[in-house]
């Protein structure tokens, strides 16, 4: 899948789940399952409930995504 095919949206982390997964509520009200991208994991960036994040969604499965940025 090419990088241009992703959909970037903003959301808020609702709850942490096992294996670096998070339940994220998007701005439009949908709740999705998101995992942490490799760069965030490599740099040990902590993501807590209530954090505002940017999520990349695949056009093929809109219920799962990848957290690419955590706002300060």
Swiss-Prot record:
UniProt GO cellular component terms: cytosol
Keywords: Cytoplasm, Initiation factor, Phosphoprotein, Protein biosynthesis, RNA-binding, rRNA-binding
InterPro entries in alphabetical order: NA-bd_OB-fold, RNA-binding_domain_S1_IF1, S1_domain, TIF_IF1
Disulfide feature: none
Gene Ontology terms, MF aspect: ribosome binding; rRNA binding; translation initiation factor activity
Coarse class of the protein's main subcellular location: cytoplasm
Pfam families linked: eIF-1a (PF01176)
PROSITE patterns tied to this protein: S1_IF1_TYPE
Boundaries of every S1-like domain copy: 1-72
Subcellular localization, as worded in the UniProt entry: Cytoplasm
Modified-residue entries (Phosphotyrosine), positions: 60
Similarity comment text for this entry: Belongs to the IF-1 family.
Subunit composition and interactions: Component of the 30S ribosomal translation pre-initiation complex which assembles on the 30S ribosome in the order IF-2 and IF-3, IF-1 and N-formylmethionyl-tRNA(fMet); mRNA recruitment can occur at any time during PIC assembly.
PANTHER family for this protein: TRANSLATION INITIATION FACTOR IF-1, CHLOROPLASTIC (PTHR33370:SF1)
NCBIfam families: infA (TIGR00008)
Primary role: One of the essential components for the initiation of protein synthesis. Stabilizes the binding of IF-2 and IF-3 on the 30S subunit to which N-formylmethionyl-tRNA(fMet) subsequently binds. Helps modulate mRNA selection, yielding the 30S pre-initiation complex (PIC). Upon addition of the 50S ribosomal subunit IF-1, IF-2 and IF-3 are released leaving the mature 70S translation initiation complex.
Protein name: Translation initiation factor IF-1
Species this protein is from: Shouchella clausii (strain KSM-K16) (Alkalihalobacillus clausii)
Gene from which the chain derives: infA
């Amino acid at each position: 899948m090419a990088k241009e095919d992703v959909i970037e949206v903003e959301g808020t982390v609702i709850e942490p789940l096992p294996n670096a997964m998070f339940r994220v509520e998007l701005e439009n009200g949908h709740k999705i399952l998101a995992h942490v991208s490799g760069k965030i994991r490599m740099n040990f960036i902590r993501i807590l409930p209530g954090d505002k994040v940017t999520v990349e969604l695949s056009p093929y499965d809109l219920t799962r995504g990848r957290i690419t940025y955590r706002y300060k």
